[in-house]
Amino acid sequence: MYFGKTRQSDQSGRVPPNQNVTTSFPVLHTGDVPYYEDMTKWNLQVYGLVDHPMLLSFEDVKAFPRYESKNDIHCVTGWSRLDNVWQGVRACDIAEKAGVKEEAGYVILHAEEGWTTNLPLDDFLAETSLLAYAHNGEPLTPEHGFPLRGVFPHLYFWKSAKWLRGIQFTKENHPGFWERNGYHMRGDPWQNQRFTWD
């Protein structure tokens, strides 16, 4: 499934349990890869329990302060990729601009084709949480989420939704696509939270 892998024991505690390091960047998703020929037709909706709902163009997103984060990512299928450098907007900056209401406790990320995933609000607001439009200094490719994807490196990588179209703040925790199909509601790789029963 992927190449250039090494054993986790070589990585001095940087790799969670039952993971192997790869130097490639595997592409995993359901459905078709969307291609945007006209970016004026793309937008990001920020809504739910917020004081200021927003409908952001790609240029609006890029007008937020640019943030760079270097981190490791861990896929629930068993691979880890180290030293990724992402550029984008801090998730907390989006939340601050929208004015998240006190009763909000969770976030639902909406992507193309109706795909969703859920996050506790604290995970969305974490210092390392990013809405990325570039990886290692280059714009995201369509296969890796162009124009915008979530990056939540402290959780399994399925939580880092590709092809983002909406950020919804909610009071209750609603399971997303993979969570409805048996994946863990939070997905902490260091706790090996892969499936509902973990």
Curated annotation (Swiss-Prot):
Gene3D superfamilies: Oxidoreductase, molybdopterin-binding domain. The keyword Metal-binding applies. Mo-molybdopterin binds at residues 75, 144, 149. This is Uncharacterized oxidoreductase YuiH. Its cofactor is Mo-molybdopterin. GO terms for molecular function: metal ion binding; oxidoreductase activity. Binds 1 Mo-molybdopterin (Mo-MPT) cofactor per subunit. Keywords: Metal-binding, Molybdenum, Oxidoreductase. Pfam families: Oxidored_molyb. Its EC number is 1.-.-.-. Residues 1-23 are annotated as: Disordered. Residues 9-23 have a biased composition (Polar residues).
